[in-house]
């Protein structure tokens, strides 16, 4: 004879009553008409130390790490953007540099 099959939602709710609300395993098992052995097994499987919670915390740690890296890279990009503009608010491109040199040469020739 096999035991009853309970849905996942029922199991997680039973575990929440013990873990989150602080009820005793015996009282929850009696109220829900299940064995304490089953409830202990569910707590082990769905409780706060279960592998799904560890995976979620690992994923959250990865998200935090990626957010820090994104901020660092964004800050570096912003610094480089600011460095690309010289003191007279013109882009430091080779064309602008050559144009200014040519302009200075033309001005110096006209003065002489």
Swiss-Prot record:
SUPFAM superfamilies: Homeodomain-like. Coiled coil: none annotated. One of its GO terms (molecular function) is transposase activity. GO terms for biological process: DNA transposition. Belongs to the transposase 8 family. PANTHER family: PROTEIN DISTAL ANTENNA. This is Putative transposase YkgN. The gene is ykgN.
């Amino acid at each position: 004879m096999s035991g009853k099959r309970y849905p996942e939602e029922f199991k997680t709710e039973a575990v929440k009553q013990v873990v989150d609300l602080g009820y005793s395993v015996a009282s929850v098992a009696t109220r829900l008409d299940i064995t304490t052995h089953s409830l202990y097994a569910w707590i082990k499987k769905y409780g706060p130390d279960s592998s799904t919670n560890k995976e979620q915390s690992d994923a959250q740690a990865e998200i935090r790490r990626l957010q820090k890296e994104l901020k660092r890279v964004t800050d570096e990009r912003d610094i480089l953007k600011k460095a690309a503009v010289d003191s007279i608010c013109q882009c430091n491109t080779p064309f602008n540099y050559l144009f200014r040199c040519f302009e200075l040469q033309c001005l110096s020739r006209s003065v002489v």
